Amino acid sequence: RLIAYVESKRYKGVARITEAFRVEYYKLVKRILEEQDQVIDCYAGWASAQIYADGTVWPCCVRADNLGNLRDHDYDFKAIWFGDKIKEVRRSIAAKECYCPLANASYTNMLIDPPTLTRVGIKVIAPE
């Protein structure tokens, strides 16, 4: 019902882009929950990172894989981001060993996913 409600509204300007992404996100979440699988590629650990208040770096806040602490690396993010720990995490994510409907990761993934961007573009340019 939420998807139908959002799609029933008519938005203008930048709000049309937001609405188009929101509908895609809701559809993505529905698929993830139904299929219990990573339905589009996840780029956590490549395109995004989480930095906890104490300086701990995670590739994804759901997995919370501790890659290291900025304080322990003289605040050198690059040393952590290209360190040894991230290699196994990236392999695991690429192998689709995890899935989640988290908005932070999902919106990043949708911005990199050509089919999603195509659907959003069509909805913005030629709304139904």
Residue ranges and their predicted role:
Residues 1-58, 62-72, 109-113:
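Radical SAM enzyme [4Fe-4S]-AdoMet core and its adjacent flexible, acidic
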